[in-house]
Amino acid sequence: METKILDGLKISKKIIKKIKKKIEKRKKKRKKIPGLAMIVIGNNPASLIYVNKKREACNQAGFFSIYWHLSNQIEEIELINLIKKLNKNKCIDGILIQLPLPIKINYLKIITSIDPKKDVDGFHPYNLGSLCQNNPQFRSCTSKGVITLLKKYKINIHGLYAVIIGSSNIVGKPMYMELLLAGCTVTIVNKNTKNIKTYVKKADLVVIAIGQPNFLYGHWIKLGAIVIDIGINYLYNKNKYKIVGDVHFKSTSVKTSYITPVPGGVGPMTVVSLLENTLQACIM
């Protein structure tokens, strides 16, 4: 069957252009420009790439951004103190902590130290809890990006049976709520689930985010299913790195109605969702 590629890169560029026009209007009216603070700890190659893409997007949209690249040796209290200063800084509308964090740093302590009004990543318990009530201040960027991408391609998911592979706080759980609110019947599975394949074979919509390259093959997929690949993995081959998703694209794409590529699918939509949230924080 003919498969349509969900081109997140193309859609994100269009959204950034619209955001840029809004920023230009704000500048003409001498209104405040959105400000985003980004913090990355250590030298994880993937984290550095993600942050650079976010910085680049800020520049394209006309945002003010500031960047901290901190050592792995930083103490938890030092990071919390930096966040507290940024909470008080009126030039900063959004605070982003690039994940993952070093093992010695408590993720929940860091996230809850961010002012919920500046939690543009949508990970604060306040915002995640509000999402359950369909009234979040900020929606988590990746799951928001997925929903936006589906809407831009006019894909109606209401009434579909959706399976999410991966139950992380960052992607799986927010994605579960987004799909539930969109009218899907949702099952979430993880590494502890037995016979994952049996759930996936019944799914109209599959979302995967587990960080395992080529985990999902085409023979798992129901003919005509929609597949959203959120995984980003770096494989070293022939003296260079290749980016692949959690889905084996070649075998899966021949069975799907819609599929996201990696790279160029969900990643750019995550970045543009961050810009939308930061602009919203500025306007609030």
UniProtKB/Swiss-Prot annotation:
Gene that this polypeptide is encoded by: folD
Protein purpose: Catalyzes the oxidation of 5,10-methylenetetrahydrofolate to 5,10-methenyltetrahydrofolate and then the hydrolysis of 5,10-methenyltetrahydrofolate to 10-formyltetrahydrofolate.
Domain of life: Bacteria
CDD domains xref list: NAD_bind_m-THF_DH_Cyclohyd
GO cellular component: cytosol
Record pathway: One-carbon metabolism; tetrahydrofolate interconversion
GO molecular function, one term: methylenetetrahydrofolate dehydrogenase (NADP+) activity
Family indicated by similarity: Belongs to the tetrahydrofolate dehydrogenase/cyclohydrolase family.
EC number: 1.5.1.5, 3.5.4.9
Catalyzed reactions: (6R)-5,10-methylene-5,6,7,8-tetrahydrofolate + NADP(+) = (6R)-5,10-methenyltetrahydrofolate + NADPH; (6R)-5,10-methenyltetrahydrofolate + H2O = (6R)-10-formyltetrahydrofolate + H(+)
One Pfam entry name: THF_DHG_CYH
Name of the protein described by the UniProt record: Bifunctional protein FolD
Keywords: Amino-acid biosynthesis, Histidine biosynthesis, Hydrolase, Methionine biosynthesis, Multifunctional enzyme, NADP, One-carbon metabolism, Oxidoreductase, Purine biosynthesis
Annotated NADP(+) binding sites: G166, S167, S168, I232
NCBIfam families per record: PRK10792.1 (NF008058)
